[in-house]
Amino acid sequence: MSKIYRHIAGGSDEQIGHIDPEHGYVYSARFGPDKYIGWVNYEKGYVYSHQLGPDKYLGWVDVTQGKIYANRLGPDQYLGQVEQDGKLYRHEPGGRDTYLGSLTDMHHPVEGAAALLFFFNDEEAEAGEVANNDDSADKTKGKAKSNKPSN
């Protein structure tokens, strides 16, 4: 099982989710049973968000380079990359990429894409933070808040 950790400067990294490699199911960690939020397609490198009706296609990973792209109207947006050792980085145009966290026991680069798209994608995270004790937080689609400091 791949475990997803958010980097905390000067402290222990926090586990925020995990991926079941047998089925590709993605779960958000919370108090009580973890919440199913989506799945990955290992053959194609695609990531899907679970929702009522058809699941939503979020993005994909270039398995040879570990580059992660979000699905957008027009050209897909480059978000960042996952390294072979499971380290996740957000792309910062004109600057050094930001280290976000890591995956332990990563089986395929698409697991890194799922971590970035579900837990570290600012655009998706603006909808709100995953409610740890409330299943009615469907508006968040399982996204957790970014680790960027708010002003």
Which residues make up each language-model segment?
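Long terminal segments
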Residues: 1-25, 56-151
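Central antiparallel beta-sheet cores of small beta-barrel/beta-sandwich binding domains
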Residues: 19, 27-42, 48, 56-61
